[in-house]
A protein has these predicted regions:
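N-terminal acidic, proline/glycine-rich, low-complexity intrinsically disordered segments
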Residues: 1-8
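Non-catalytic, surface beta->alpha helical segment in thiol-disulfide oxidoreductase systems
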Residues: 2, 83-118
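Acidic, proline-/serine-/threonine-rich low-complexity intrinsically disordered repeat tracts
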Residues: 11-12
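Local sequence-structure signature of Cys/Sec-based thiol-disulfide redox active-site neighborhoods
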Residues: 16-58, 129-167
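Charged, alpha-helix-enriched surfaces in structured cytosolic catalytic cores
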Residues: 21, 98-101, 150, 174
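Thioredoxin-like thiol-disulfide oxidoreductase module
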Residues: 57-86, 164-180
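Long, charged amphipathic helices and adjacent flexible linkers at domain junctions
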Residues: 116-131
């Protein structure tokens, strides 16, 4: 099992997932974070676990308001991680590596968890907040899907606004056994 903070047996150079210009752009967006945000990792033993660990460290390194904790959870898919305002229950979950088209979904989830207001009409936000009942949505995505980010971002927005809504983005390629 791979844990956050664990050193690799070989001191190979970590591959950066993002280009320096992209990192600078994300860093500037993260300046809008008002409240501390946690990335809560449940990495398990699958091959992508170490890559997700490195990616989370890369993202957390862009703001002193973002921290990473390791919390193995038998109820969660592994490898996965959640985004939450520090001290609150996580409602936005990522089972896979949100890169490519899905990177924006992660950035927005972090911003919303950190208190940056969503860009949506107040009437829509009020309707989402007023939804009764508990909801847990799961979205299977592929990183080549051009429509998937819109769905993921809409459901993450709902989860950010209403504490009774949860959403999990699932990389279908990483969890093939669930979609076959």
């Amino acid at each position: 099992m791979f844990f956050l903070g664990q050193k690799k047996k070989t001191e190979e150079k970590k591959a950066n997932h993002l280009e320096p210009a992209m990192l600078d752009q994300i860093r500037s967006h993260f300046e809008k974070i008002r409240h501390p945000v946690e990335l809560i990792a449940s990495l398990g033993e699958k091959p992508k676990a170490e890559e997700i660990h490195d990616f989370l460290e890369e993202i957390a390194g862009l703001s002193d308001k973002i921290s990473i904790t390791s919390k193995p959870d038998a109820e969660r898919r592994a490898p996965s991680f959640s985004v939450a305002r520090k001290g609150e229950d996580a409602r936005m979950h990522f089972a896979g590596l949100p890169v490519g088209h899905e990177l924006t979904s992660l950035i927005l989830a972090i911003l919303h968890a950190g208190g940056h207001p969503p860009k949506a009409e107040q009437a829509l936000i009020d309707r989402i907040r007023d939804l009764k009942g508990d909801f847990h949505f799961e979205t299977y995505i592929t990183l080549s899907c051009h429509n998937c980010p819109d769905v993921v971002q809409a459901l993450n927005l709902m989860a950010a606004v209403n504490p009774r809504i949860q959403h999990t983005m699932i990389d279908g390629k990483l969890f093939l056994d669930e979609i076959e």
